[in-house]
């Protein structure tokens, strides 16, 4: 942890990691049986690349504001050949740097109405393809992007996007190609994603926000100092109650390949805050992944929790001590 923290400090100073530093991180993780999987979130969540290369966006401008910790509503243009050539090169380079079999391409929170719907290039593409909705452009967009992943012998991962705020995935992406692994994350919509992926044969990773988002505060009053958009509270006990199979039969959850805790960094100042937010809830998520609900025991978990937390603190790792359950252990 200290070594990774040093890397992060250097990254903030130099604004990037070299390929050699990245290789060292990957090796450090591999020695601890951790696989590092890269993610490129497209076509939304692209404010960083659009700040550097604004011509890739639907705004068709040469300058864009540089915004830190915000996603804004910017998106890549679906009808711009430079977008595809740039990302083909990026995916090729990432494939050579990361030994993982997977590359995550995102696909979530695409604000299509403010971009592709109003973009003259995208509208021309819609007309050519006979599409009625701009969200249908996700079909050719991801067809090409997924092919770039596959031509590098990698397996693509996408977020399972079903929220009505954004064009739901079943408007344009279901059935996903069967070799695409999906991640369920939208709070309250996991059962729908679980059923759709079972029906269409996609491997599924479970990371529902109401249980597995480690950037959410652990207790009321423990909200981050900045970039807090009104996050809900996810207590340790709530994380421990996570049932990855959501009560369905073993057969209907057989396509679930694991669980994932997500720790988004826009409200995380440093490595100490990161580990503070992750632990002890990461212990609860781990147990959710390897222990069936019928064998889960909250009282047993609490008894096993404190020795592990004590051991981490002795090693200088910042953790949150769950004082609210201390008198009940």
Predicted segment positions?
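A short, Lys/Arg-rich alpha-helix, primarily the initiator
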Residues: 1-14
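Residue-level marker for well-ordered alpha-helical positions
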Residues: 6, 142-143, 191, 306
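Residues within the alpha-helical elements of helix-turn-helix
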Residues: 14-15, 28
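Substrate-binding cleft of carbohydrate-active enzyme catalytic domains
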Residues: 20, 25-158
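Flexible, acidic glycine-rich loops studded with aromatic residues
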Residues: 158-163, 169-329
